[in-house]
């Protein structure tokens, strides 16, 4: 894992090409591929497709990267949107508390936490530990920087997902603007498109590599004993 400082700039600077704006998302799909460290930043690599009916088997519009907090925030917005549409409750995971760089004190020492990539492979998220308030300088123990925070959110990597997810509705449940709203309000795809960054050959190669780091279990046990983030030693 690495820093997520690019998230701050991503939230204020989108791709910026109005000619590429997409207003109706009905035909599009997104395929999250991996969570990797690229150019010293933790990013989600994903491909976008213009014909969702082909289930991401055709040529992609492109393969891009977005800062992990940016992508995860959009992913959660999409889950909330889906839940609202199905009239079910949605509870945000504990990890959502660390979308921004968040201060914690452990055994009298200052740390900062933020969602990023896990150390044990490219298909998982983690809450990472940093030494500075911008979450740019990783704080490691035996080479690992994942904190002991419950990982209660998983991205469905390598799964083709339509940008617009329809649910069965009775005519009495919807008004005239429902379909227009659904077609234009696709939180995950809209945000991923707006804040997309270039993912070159090196970036795409990293996304194809799924390698677990040897010795993770031992390092994890050390972290569990050192960073008890929900123990009495924590001062918020």
Describe the predicted segments one by one.
Residues 1-236:
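Mature extracellular/luminal domains of secreted and GPI-anchored eukaryotic proteins, especially small
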């Amino acid at each position: 894992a690495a820093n997520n400082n690019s998230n701050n700039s991503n939230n204020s600077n989108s791709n910026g090409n109005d000619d590429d704006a997409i207003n109706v998302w009905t035909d599009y799909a997104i395929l999250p591929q991996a969570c990797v460290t690229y150019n010293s930043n933790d990013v989600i690599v994903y491909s976008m497709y213009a014909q969702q009916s082909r289930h991401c088997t055709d040529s992609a519009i492109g393969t891009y990267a977005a800062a992990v907090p940016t992508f995860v925030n959009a992913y959660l917005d999409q889950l909330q949107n889906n839940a609202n549409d199905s009239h079910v409750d949605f509870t945000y995971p504990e990890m959502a508390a660390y979308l921004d760089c968040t201060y914690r004190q452990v055994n009298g020492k200052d740390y900062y936490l933020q969602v990023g990539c896990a150390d044990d492979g490219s298909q998982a998220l983690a809450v990472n530990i940093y030494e500075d308030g911008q979450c740019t300088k990783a704080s490691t123990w035996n080479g690992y920087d994942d904190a002991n925070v419950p990982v209660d959110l998983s991205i469905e990597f390598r799964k083709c997902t339509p940008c617009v997810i329809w649910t069965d509705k009775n005519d009495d449940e919807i008004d005239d603007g429902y379909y227009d709203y659904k077609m234009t309000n696709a939180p995950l795809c809209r945000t991923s498109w707006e804040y997309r960054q270039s993912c070159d050959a090196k970036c795409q190669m990293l996304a194809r590599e799924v390698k677990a780091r040897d010795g993770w279990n031992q390092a994890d046990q050390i972290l569990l004993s050192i960073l008890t983030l929900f123990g009495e030693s924590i001062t918020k």
